[in-house]
């Protein structure tokens, strides 16, 4: 029998100490990694619940195990809420990650060797959109499109490649593209060649939910998203469709093809996050995310930095560091010393290796969750610029670190 009175700190002080240190880091550092965010205490409570004890292979009312009457309620809540959130007719909330959701979409209608057309990883796409190092680039014949000379998504190239290669599926969505994507244009191109249209909106889902980014669901055969990032939920994935045409194929692609039992505690946490995203205040959050990102990009331009694509229309943008003679790896390290967390990121036509890069990626989702407004975003962008101007000056880094501490103390991640 387990005792509820025994704490983690009592049972495993080493692990508890590491968690406490990470908690302190999150409080003391400004998080600007575009794929990260903070979840609510309610989300964490659901994910840490007794639901982790329950195996539930199958789907609500169609399980391979007994005792699933209550987890059925949990999963159905998540399904109903995410369908309402994005206007979808079909939803599968069981994918353990966005990558597995994407794999399931491919497996539902494609055969090995079929051609897919996706955004190049080097131009802002994602590994799972056909990159050669990913299973999607090994199982399928992946053709890639990219950005034009103005660093805008090249729809003419997408159409040209689609007409030339006749892909069975066109993949839209990105992990490092700042501008809005024209889903209707992608639908038009897909229809010209009889291709399925699949959108991975993992980075933009929270903005879509908040009405600050176009909703791809009405235009697509398949839509996937992660449930963290801008959506502010637990780490996991979701598949959505505008109708139920592919319901059977998608469900079987997840279970039993790619996964076994669903993570019911995570699905419960997803349900909480979906409820939060349905509230009016989430729309204000999404609006502020876009405002903060735009302000930061504009302020960095004023400080002489170059923003890929020239601006942002979302939560994310890339900074080209080549004019400053500093790599993304070095910039990430210097900013980290100042308690500003970013990730190094390749820019279009990057001459550096992927583990070095010539750029950094900046996102505003997590800082906005803390309560940062446009005034704070302006201050923060100047602190970033200060570090990049003198990345090896320890006195400069210490000065910036002190200013970051003041900002973080003003906006605690979790209040009382």
Swiss-Prot record:
Annotated binding of (6S)-5,6,7,8-tetrahydrofolate, by residue: 121, 125-127
Q: Which CDD domains match?
A: SHMT (cd00378)
User: Which Pfam families does the record associate with it?
Assistant: SHMT
State a GO cellular component annotated for this protein: cytosol
Instruction: Describe the family membership recorded for this protein in Swiss-Prot or TrEMBL.
Output: Belongs to the SHMT family.
User: How would you summarize the oligomeric state and partners of this protein?
Assistant: Homodimer.
Q: What is this protein called?
A: Serine hydroxymethyltransferase
Q: Which reaction does it catalyse?
A: (6R)-5,10-methylene-5,6,7,8-tetrahydrofolate + glycine + H2O = (6S)-5,6,7,8-tetrahydrofolate + L-serine
The job of this chain, per UniProt, is described as: Catalyzes the reversible interconversion of serine and glycine with tetrahydrofolate (THF) serving as the one-carbon carrier. This reaction serves as the major source of one-carbon groups required for the biosynthesis of purines, thymidylate, methionine, and other important biomolecules. Also exhibits THF-independent aldolase activity toward beta-hydroxyamino acids, producing glycine and aldehydes, via a retro-aldol mechanism.
**Which GO BP terms sit in this record?**
glycine biosynthetic process from serine; tetrahydrofolate interconversion
The scientific name of the source species is Neisseria gonorrhoeae (strain NCCP11945)
């Amino acid at each position: 029998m387990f005792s509820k009175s025994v704490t983690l700190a009592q049972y495993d002080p080493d692990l508890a100490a590491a968690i406490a240190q990470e908690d302190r880091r999150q409080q003391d550092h400004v998080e600007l990694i575009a794929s990260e965010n903070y979840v609510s205490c309610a989300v964490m409570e659901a994910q840490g619940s007794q639901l982790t004890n329950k195996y539930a292979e199958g789907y609500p009312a169609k399980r391979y195990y007994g005792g699933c009457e209550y987890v059925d309620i949990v999963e159905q809540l998540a399904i109903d809420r995410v369908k309402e959130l994005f206007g979808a007719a079909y939803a599968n909330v069981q994918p353990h990650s966005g990558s597995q959701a994407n794999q399931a979409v491919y497996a539902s209608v494609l055969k090995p060797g079929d051609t897919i057309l996706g955004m190049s990883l080097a131009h802002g796409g994602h590994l799972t959109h056909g990159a050669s190092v990913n299973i999607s680039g090994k199982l399928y014949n992946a053709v890639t499109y990219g950005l034009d000379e103005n660093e805008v998504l090249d729809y003419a190239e997408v159409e040209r490649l689609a007409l030339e290669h006749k892909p069975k599926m066109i993949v839209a969505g990105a992990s490092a593209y700042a501008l809005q994507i024209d889903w209707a244009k992608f639908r038009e191109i897909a229809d010209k060649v009889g291709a399925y249209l699949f959108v991975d909106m993992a980075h933009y889902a929270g903005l879509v939910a908040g009405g600050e980014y176009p909703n791809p669901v009405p235009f697509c055969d398949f839509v996937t998203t992660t449930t963290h990032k801008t959506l502010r939920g637990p780490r996991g994935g979701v598949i959505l469709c505008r109708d139920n045409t592919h319901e059977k194929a998608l469900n079987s692609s997840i279970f039993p093809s790619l996964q076994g039992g669903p993570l019911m505690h995570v699905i419960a946490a997803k349900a909480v996050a979906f409820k939060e995203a349905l509230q009016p205040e989430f729309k204000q959050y999404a609006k502020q995310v876009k405002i903060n990102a735009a302000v930061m990009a504009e302020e960095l331009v004023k400080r002489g930095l170059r923003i890929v694509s020239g601006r942002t229309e979302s939560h994310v943008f890339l900074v080209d560091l080549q004019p400053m003679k500093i790599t993304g790896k070095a910039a990430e390290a210097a900013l980290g010393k100042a308690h500003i967390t970013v990730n190094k990121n390749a820019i279009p036509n990057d001459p550096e290796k992927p583990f070095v890069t010539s750029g950094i990626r900046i996102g505003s989702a997590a800082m906005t969750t803390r309560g940062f407004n446009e005034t704070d975003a302006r201050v923060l962008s100047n602190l970033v610029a200060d570090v990049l101007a003198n990345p090896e000056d320890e006195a400069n880094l210490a000065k910036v670190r002190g200013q970051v501490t003041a900002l973080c103390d003003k906006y605690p991640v979790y209040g009382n």
